[in-house]
Amino acid sequence: MGGLLLAALLALVAVPRAQAMWLGRLDPKQLLGPWYVLAVASREKSFAVEKDMKNVAGVVVTLTPENNLRLLSSQHGLQGCSQSVTELLKRNSGWVFENPSIGVLELRVLATNFRDYAIIFTQLEFGDEPFNTVELYSRREAASQEAMGLFTKWSRGLGFLSQQQAQLQKDLTCAHKILS
Protein backbone atom coordinates (compact mmCIF):
# COMPACT_ATOMS: atom_id res chain seq x y z
CA MET A 1 0.00 0.00 0.00
CA GLY A 2 2.89 2.34 0.77
CA GLY A 3 4.09 1.91 -2.82
CA LEU A 4 0.70 2.97 -4.19
CA LEU A 5 0.63 6.03 -1.97
CA LEU A 6 4.17 6.95 -3.03
CA ALA A 7 3.21 6.53 -6.70
CA ALA A 8 0.17 8.77 -6.22
CA LEU A 9 2.28 11.39 -4.47
CA LEU A 10 4.91 11.30 -7.21
CA ALA A 11 2.22 11.68 -9.85
CA LEU A 12 0.88 14.76 -8.07
CA VAL A 13 4.39 16.23 -7.84
CA ALA A 14 4.97 15.53 -11.54
CA VAL A 15 2.13 17.87 -12.59
CA PRO A 16 3.47 20.47 -15.00
CA ARG A 17 4.61 23.52 -13.04
CA ALA A 18 2.34 25.96 -14.92
CA GLN A 19 -0.75 23.89 -14.13
CA ALA A 20 0.26 23.50 -10.49
CA MET A 21 0.77 27.27 -10.16
CA TRP A 22 -2.58 27.91 -11.87
CA LEU A 23 -4.39 25.67 -9.41
CA GLY A 24 -2.45 27.27 -6.55
CA ARG A 25 -4.37 30.48 -7.27
CA LEU A 26 -7.70 28.68 -7.18
CA ASP A 27 -10.24 30.66 -5.21
CA PRO A 28 -12.44 28.26 -3.22
CA LYS A 29 -15.46 30.38 -4.18
CA GLN A 30 -15.03 29.16 -7.77
CA LEU A 31 -15.89 25.65 -6.59
CA LEU A 32 -19.09 26.72 -4.84
CA GLY A 33 -22.52 25.62 -5.96
CA PRO A 34 -24.16 22.49 -7.34
CA TRP A 35 -22.25 19.62 -8.96
CA TYR A 36 -23.04 16.20 -10.38
CA VAL A 37 -20.48 13.47 -9.61
CA LEU A 38 -20.41 11.59 -12.93
CA ALA A 39 -17.33 9.36 -12.71
CA VAL A 40 -15.19 7.88 -9.95
CA ALA A 41 -11.88 6.05 -9.70
CA SER A 42 -11.35 4.41 -6.32
CA ARG A 43 -8.98 2.06 -4.56
CA GLU A 44 -11.63 1.19 -1.97
CA LYS A 45 -11.69 -2.62 -1.61
CA SER A 46 -15.36 -3.06 -2.52
CA PHE A 47 -15.44 -0.51 -5.36
CA ALA A 48 -14.58 -2.85 -8.25
CA VAL A 49 -17.45 -5.19 -7.28
CA GLU A 50 -20.01 -2.41 -6.68
CA LYS A 51 -19.05 0.10 -9.38
CA ASP A 52 -21.64 -1.03 -11.93
CA MET A 53 -24.43 -0.33 -9.43
CA LYS A 54 -23.32 3.19 -8.46
CA ASN A 55 -25.47 6.10 -9.59
CA VAL A 56 -24.71 9.75 -10.21
CA ALA A 57 -24.45 11.68 -6.93
CA GLY A 58 -25.19 15.31 -6.24
CA VAL A 59 -22.94 17.67 -4.27
CA VAL A 60 -23.54 21.26 -3.22
CA VAL A 61 -20.34 23.04 -2.16
CA THR A 62 -20.51 26.03 0.20
CA LEU A 63 -18.06 27.92 2.42
CA THR A 64 -18.57 28.41 6.13
CA PRO A 65 -17.84 31.80 7.75
CA GLU A 66 -14.46 30.30 8.81
CA ASN A 67 -13.64 29.51 5.14
CA ASN A 68 -14.08 25.79 5.66
CA LEU A 69 -15.53 23.80 2.80
CA ARG A 70 -18.99 22.32 3.42
CA LEU A 71 -20.20 19.53 1.12
CA LEU A 72 -23.86 18.52 1.11
CA SER A 73 -24.12 15.27 -0.83
CA SER A 74 -26.97 13.04 -1.90
CA GLN A 75 -26.32 9.55 -3.22
CA HIS A 76 -28.04 6.21 -3.58
CA GLY A 77 -27.62 3.91 -0.58
CA LEU A 78 -29.05 0.61 0.61
CA GLN A 79 -32.26 2.29 1.77
CA GLY A 80 -32.74 4.76 -1.06
CA CYS A 81 -31.26 8.24 -1.21
CA SER A 82 -29.08 9.32 1.68
CA GLN A 83 -27.82 12.80 2.35
CA SER A 84 -24.78 13.83 4.35
CA VAL A 85 -22.93 17.01 5.24
CA THR A 86 -19.14 17.03 5.45
CA GLU A 87 -17.10 19.98 6.65
CA LEU A 88 -13.45 20.18 5.62
CA LEU A 89 -10.83 22.48 7.12
CA LYS A 90 -8.48 24.46 4.89
CA ARG A 91 -4.82 23.55 5.25
CA ASN A 92 -2.25 26.32 5.42
CA SER A 93 -0.33 25.09 2.38
CA GLY A 94 -1.99 25.57 -0.97
CA TRP A 95 -5.59 24.86 -1.83
CA VAL A 96 -6.08 21.67 0.16
CA PHE A 97 -8.83 20.72 2.61
CA GLU A 98 -8.97 17.98 5.25
CA ASN A 99 -10.83 16.60 8.25
CA PRO A 100 -8.86 13.64 9.65
CA SER A 101 -11.35 13.15 12.49
CA ILE A 102 -13.90 11.86 9.93
CA GLY A 103 -11.40 10.06 7.69
CA VAL A 104 -10.79 12.75 5.05
CA LEU A 105 -7.01 13.15 5.02
CA GLU A 106 -6.87 15.37 1.93
CA LEU A 107 -9.13 16.87 -0.73
CA ARG A 108 -7.64 18.85 -3.59
CA VAL A 109 -8.62 20.01 -7.06
CA LEU A 110 -6.41 18.42 -9.73
CA ALA A 111 -7.92 20.20 -12.75
CA THR A 112 -10.82 22.53 -13.49
CA ASN A 113 -11.98 25.05 -16.06
CA PHE A 114 -13.86 26.91 -13.29
CA ARG A 115 -17.25 26.67 -15.09
CA ASP A 116 -18.08 23.15 -16.23
CA TYR A 117 -15.98 20.55 -14.44
CA ALA A 118 -13.52 19.81 -11.66
CA ILE A 119 -11.34 16.74 -11.14
CA ILE A 120 -11.16 16.11 -7.38
CA PHE A 121 -8.56 13.94 -5.59
CA THR A 122 -9.39 12.68 -2.09
CA GLN A 123 -7.25 10.64 0.32
CA LEU A 124 -9.47 8.77 2.79
CA GLU A 125 -9.09 6.41 5.70
CA PHE A 126 -12.07 4.53 7.11
CA GLY A 127 -11.28 2.07 9.87
CA ASP A 128 -8.14 0.25 8.84
CA GLU A 129 -8.66 0.89 5.10
CA PRO A 130 -6.73 3.81 3.60
CA PHE A 131 -7.57 4.56 -0.04
CA ASN A 132 -7.89 7.41 -2.48
CA THR A 133 -10.37 8.49 -5.11
CA VAL A 134 -10.52 10.70 -8.16
CA GLU A 135 -13.96 12.12 -8.98
CA LEU A 136 -15.33 14.02 -11.95
CA TYR A 137 -17.57 16.88 -10.81
CA SER A 138 -19.71 18.42 -13.55
CA ARG A 139 -22.11 21.37 -13.54
CA ARG A 140 -24.27 19.48 -16.07
CA GLU A 141 -25.87 16.04 -16.14
CA ALA A 142 -23.46 14.94 -18.88
CA ALA A 143 -19.72 15.55 -18.94
CA SER A 144 -17.92 17.22 -21.81
CA GLN A 145 -15.32 15.28 -23.80
CA GLU A 146 -12.66 17.53 -22.30
CA ALA A 147 -13.77 16.69 -18.75
CA MET A 148 -13.97 12.92 -19.40
CA GLY A 149 -10.57 13.01 -21.08
CA LEU A 150 -8.99 14.76 -18.09
CA PHE A 151 -10.68 12.39 -15.65
CA THR A 152 -9.26 9.42 -17.57
CA LYS A 153 -5.82 11.03 -17.84
CA TRP A 154 -5.61 11.79 -14.10
CA SER A 155 -6.99 8.40 -13.08
CA ARG A 156 -4.51 6.51 -15.24
CA GLY A 157 -1.68 8.88 -14.30
CA LEU A 158 -2.32 8.16 -10.62
CA GLY A 159 -2.18 4.41 -11.31
CA PHE A 160 -5.87 3.48 -11.19
CA LEU A 161 -6.63 0.29 -13.11
CA SER A 162 -9.62 0.12 -15.47
CA GLN A 163 -11.58 -2.00 -12.96
CA GLN A 164 -11.06 0.79 -10.40
CA GLN A 165 -12.75 3.40 -12.65
CA ALA A 166 -16.43 3.90 -13.44
CA GLN A 167 -18.77 6.25 -15.20
CA LEU A 168 -21.72 6.31 -12.84
CA GLN A 169 -25.21 5.14 -13.84
CA LYS A 170 -27.39 7.94 -15.20
CA ASP A 171 -30.02 7.59 -12.46
CA LEU A 172 -30.23 11.20 -11.24
CA THR A 173 -32.96 10.63 -8.64
CA CYS A 174 -30.75 11.17 -5.59
CA ALA A 175 -28.70 13.96 -7.18
CA HIS A 176 -31.88 15.89 -7.98
CA LYS A 177 -32.98 15.75 -4.32
CA ILE A 178 -30.46 18.52 -3.58
CA LEU A 179 -29.71 19.95 -7.04
CA SER A 180 -33.25 20.75 -8.23
From Swiss-Prot:
Pfam families: Lipocalin (PF00061). It comes from the Eukaryota. Residues 1-20 form the signal peptide. GO terms for biological process: single fertilization. The keyword Cell inner membrane does not apply. Keywords: Disulfide bond, Fertilization, Secreted, Signal. One of its GO terms (cellular component) is extracellular region. GO terms for molecular function: small molecule binding. This is Epididymal-specific lipocalin-6. It comes from Macaca mulatta.
